């Protein structure tokens, strides 16, 4: 495990909107680069790969991904205390109001809502958006391509990424077949754990 204490003597500040799996990848990378990281999310976050997402902290109070711990906080002062412990602060703050107190050097919108949920290029010295919904040079400084394929992770400094197709990327020859959609509203009780081997028709 890398000792971050020396890096943290000259730390910069990053605010990540969202705390799902992709947002967590961003947050972890920034943490390892020496940034203090605050992640914001909605009160009931939806996460595809929740075992590797800081969004679990919203439900459980804390989450750990690759040895890096995220702690749920309720205020900016609590967030500062968590940052002093060299951990990531996670806060329920859908509009990222904490940005006004935190004054981040970098803001990354990793909500993946397929549209801009209020992020502005003036929110921080450097503002980056993930996926469709952003225009580099207009509402953000840069956009990261999230569409699977040869352009994945391309950095766009002028213009937009590939539009949302509504169809997930192909994995093993399957796209829409990889999704299970609920037939109605309600609470889901899982019958298998993430990582379990399942068979077609099992559920």
State what each model feature region is.
Residues 2-203:
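Well-ordered secondary-structure scaffolds
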């Amino acid at each position: 495990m890398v000792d971050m204490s020396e890096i943290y003597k000259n730390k910069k500040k990053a605010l990540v909107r969202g705390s799902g799996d992709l947002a967590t990848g961003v947050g972890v990378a920034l943490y390892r680069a020496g940034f203090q990281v605050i992640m914001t999310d909605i009160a009931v976050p939806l996460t595809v790969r929740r075992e590797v997402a800081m969004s679990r902290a919203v439900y459980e109070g804390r989450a750990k991904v690759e040895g890096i711990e995220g702690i749920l906080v309720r205020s900016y002062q609590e967030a500062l205390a968590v940052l002093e412990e060299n951990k990531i602060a996670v806060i329920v703050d859908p509009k990222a109001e904490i940005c006004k107190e935190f004054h981040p050097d970098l803001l990354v919108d990793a909500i993946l809502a397929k549209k801009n949920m209020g992020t502005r290029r003036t929110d921080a010295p450097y503002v980056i958006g993930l996926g469709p919904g952003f225009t580099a040079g207009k509402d953000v400084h840069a956009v990261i391509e999230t569409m699977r394929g040869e352009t994945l992770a391309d950095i766009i400094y002028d213009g937009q990424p590939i539009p949302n197709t509504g169809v997930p990327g192909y994995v093993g020859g399957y796209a829409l077949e990889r999704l299970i959609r609920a037939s109605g509203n309600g609470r889901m009780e899982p019958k298998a754990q993430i990582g379990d081997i399942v068979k077609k028709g099992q559920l």
